[in-house]
Amino acid sequence: MRPRRSHPRKPIGLALLLLLAFGLAQTASADGITYRSVKYPEFAQWRAACAKLPSNRMLLGQAATTKLETALPAFDEVATALRAAFESFKTGSMNPAANWVGGKPKAAEFFNTNRAYFLKPPIPFQPFAQKLQVPAGSEVIFHGDFHGDIHSFIATLDSLNQAGTLDGFRLAKPNCYMVFLGDYTDRGFYGIEVLYTLLRLKLANPDRVFMARGNHEDVQMIPTYGFLAECQKKYANLFNPALIGRLYDFFPVVIYVGSGTDFLQCNHGGMEPGYLPGALLDAKPAVAYQLLGQVTGGTFLAKHPQLLQSADATRRVFLKSTIRDYTPLAPMTPLINGFMWNDFTVFASEPGLGYMDGRGFVFGKTGTRIVLNASAGAAAKVRGVFRAHQHSFAVNPMMRRLVAGNGLFRHWHEHDSLAKADATAAVLRSECKLEHSAGRPLKDGSVWTFNVAPDSYYGKGNSYKFDTYGVLTTGAAFADWKLRVVNQVIPVLKTLPAGQ
């Protein structure tokens, strides 16, 4: 993880810039395409192709080669799905002006996939928030970071097919939705397969599958963390990164999932006090959108001085000078977006607001409560946070709790403390009463972090082979909402040799 909160704009490399420019030129005649896969018309064929791929953990540490195995030998298969997705975004729930709070973005900019903020002449970078209001009794399936782990993704879809939730790529159960929490590529060798699978789900269920934008959904990240290299090895100069870059612009940085007047903030990173969703949550459409516009963190701090007071006294001057109003020009320019980057403390005794160099702001229990309270509308309330992002290759207190909690951790456990930071899983479960059962109680003001998929550096470094997804069932009142955690050992990891 790289940027500081205040981050000077870093020029995109010339080679990538040329690739992006060429790619956008190629999209000019893409309008009106209807997606249909000839190679993989059904999920079963796609599943079989992915099953032939070696695991990420088998490939880690091997000498670099000029070629990578892929289930998508021709980039055209991906490009066709991407262009169909663009049409779906343009003509679906984003199309009616009535679904946009504060005004619909310009067709010649936001919806013009032949232009981009990362090229000249640039169009504005326009991050946005989404509301997804579902009927009481609905199921919403959540998954955290994949980071190029196609085997865990396929295992999740297998599980949902076996449960009757999915029929292939199609959601078979009524009032069932899927929300993915960002970081789909980088740090793994099958990012393109993960993106393609997301697109297949989205195209089969355009109004029920949604993807949040993580910090790795950024054209400035992919040259550094592996996705660009992966695709160049698979497709050489046939790879079209501009299509990928524009896809990311249609992913909301935050999705407020709710029923009635109760909502959960669902995003990749953490809190962003510079955007308050009250007007969005009070809007009449069940699916609604709002551009973030100017991010007004400095204004929030002035109106809510208790947030700064919740910080350690030695950090307040720095925090006050760093949290300021700004207009976003790119995901990390001039400042990083908190929904994509920020984190949370592990223990309730830690400060309500802090900062970690290389990642961003860290919100504690009191600071989070302040922002959640301010996020309410006239009737709507934000009850908590579902997110991902906060993972490490190395064993640390957060990863210990994610693994001991069977892939889902509720921050600020009542019986946990800094004194038990490095406790074993057995101690965390017995003495700290760390939640690890399938059913989890939802508490007002709680923050939940989903683990990263296991066929990865993270799984290897922290010695786990199971993947996790959550099933949220909404109710007429927030007290009736239920959360179920599903774990499964990934088949390709069962026979890994020692050390992998």
Give a label for each model feature.
Residues 30-500:
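Feature recognizes metal-dependent phosphohydrolase scaffolds
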Residues 1-9:
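N-terminal secretory signal peptides that target proteins for export/translocation
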Residues 13-23:
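Bacterial N-terminal signal peptides
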Residues 24-29:
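Sec/Tat signal peptide C-region and signal peptidase I cleavage site
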